[in-house]
Amino acid sequence: SPATMGFAGVR
């Protein structure tokens, strides 16, 4: 999810 880090969350 995007809430993880922003870039790694998208993956």
Curated annotation (Swiss-Prot):
Modified residues (Arginine amide): 11
Recorded GO CC terms: extracellular region
Domain of life: Eukaryota
Record-annotated disulphide pairs: none
Compartments in which it is found: Secreted
Keyword tags: Amidation, Neuropeptide, Secreted
Keyword Cell inner membrane carried by entry: no
Spans traversing the lipid bilayer: none
GO biological process: neuropeptide signaling pathway
Protein's job: Myoactive peptide. Increases the amplitude and frequency of spontaneous contractions and tonus of hindgut muscle.
Protein name per Swiss-Prot or TrEMBL: Tachykinin-related peptide 7
Native source species: Rhodnius prolixus (Triatomid bug)
